[in-house]
Amino acid sequence: MLSPKRTKYRKAHKGRIHGTAKGGTSLNFGAYGLKAVEPMRVTARQIESARRAITRHLKRQGRVWIRIFPDLPVSTKPAEVRMGSGKGSPEFWAARVHPGRIMFEVDGVPLDLAKRAFELAAAKLPIKTRFITRLGEGGEA
């Protein structure tokens, strides 16, 4: 699973995901992509699960790029613990995904195969997504 090698701080503020993505909104590597439509936090496990769904459906042909990285430590407190006494310990890593952000890209495969692979990946993610191509959204290639 993806996680940073080292960070400046062990814990981070929860924060909010305001506005749209400033960068990473266009296809840079592949011919097809999966774009986020709503703001949400995506965990490293969810990213890995979606990646596996894509690579398994493509049967190792073509190339897959992951355009998001889980760099936010999410801390939780144990069950049935009283309020106070500090923040919990970091449990997992997540990526803040803004609307318009390209999350995955694929190249070297036919349109229908890429579309089905991204449908399978989207089912693994907690976020509404849209399939896009070099020419535009929806798959008019």
From Swiss-Prot:
InterPro entries: Ribosomal_uL16 (IPR047873), Ribosomal_uL16_bact-type (IPR000114), Ribosomal_uL16_CS (IPR020798), Ribosomal_uL16_dom (IPR016180), Ribosomal_uL16_sf (IPR036920). GO terms for biological process: translation. Pfam families: Ribosomal_L16 (PF00252). GO terms for cellular component: cytosolic large ribosomal subunit. Keywords: Ribonucleoprotein, Ribosomal protein, RNA-binding, rRNA-binding, tRNA-binding. One of its GO terms (molecular function) is tRNA binding. Part of the 50S ribosomal subunit. Belongs to the universal ribosomal protein uL16 family. Binds 23S rRNA and is also seen to make contacts with the A and possibly P site tRNAs. This is Large ribosomal subunit protein uL16. It comes from Rhodospirillum centenum (strain ATCC 51521 / SW).
